[in-house]
Curated annotation (Swiss-Prot):
Highest taxon in the source lineage: Bacteria
Biological classification of the source: Bacteria, Pseudomonadati, Pseudomonadota, Alphaproteobacteria, Hyphomicrobiales
Subcellular location: Cell membrane
Main localisation: membrane
TM helices/strands, residue ranges: 4-24, 30-50
Annotated Gene Ontology cellular component terms: plasma membrane
Keywords assigned: Cell membrane, Membrane, Transmembrane, Transmembrane helix
Signal peptide (residue range): none
Membrane disposition: Multi-pass membrane protein
Protein name: UPF0391 membrane protein RPB_2024
Family of this protein: Belongs to the UPF0391 family.
One matching Pfam family: DUF1328
């Protein structure tokens, strides 16, 4: 799940750079949505990992 969070975060950052650079105005809103989704997914996966107490082997 953490891999998906990182993927969405990278996509959001790229879309944000393109949008704020003036290349695509619509990508600003897309970047905001994807960024917040990535933050929520990161927090959820962090909490689940802490609650389960998983250790990596």
């Amino acid at each position: 799940m953490l891999g998906w969070v990182v993927t969405f975060l990278v996509v959001a950052l790229i879309a944000g750079l393109l949008g704020f650079g003036g290349i695509a105005g619509a990508s600003i809103e897309i970047a905001k949505v994807i960024f917040f989704i990535a933050i929520v997914l990161f927090l959820v996966s962090a909490v689940v990992g802490l609650v389960r107490g998983r250790t990596r082997v």
